[in-house]
Amino acid sequence: MSETAAVTGSGPEVRSGGCLCGKVRFTVTGPVDDPHICACTDCAKRSGAPFQWWVGFPMAGLEWTGAEPTWFDTHPGKTARGFCPDCGSHIAALDYGGATIIGILATALDGHESDQALVPTNLNRLSEAAPWLAQVG
């Protein structure tokens, strides 16, 4: 198994990831929750792309192993997004009010391209997507 793949076995799944420059690093322990693509206008504006690929993990299983991200209140009092203050990489999303799941951008995870547990199961907010998105594929 490569270093970048999820570590499994008798214990829980552990994945690591971080930003482009390496300043922000983290590990997440626990099962994948709701891997999906979001095509909402907020995700599109933040990323400069037509959608973002999200996956949830138990909040209790998150550990920042490098610098923590800078948080931006996307929807003040409701939702924040975490990014690297140096390279600008988008890392995470957090709902306020006792959230038990943290959203991690799948592309921030090491080895995301070969981790079958991260394959998106749905496309959220298609009504806000670029009109051509549903035609691609």
Name the predicted role of every residue range.
Residues 2-137:
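A short Gly-Trp-Pro
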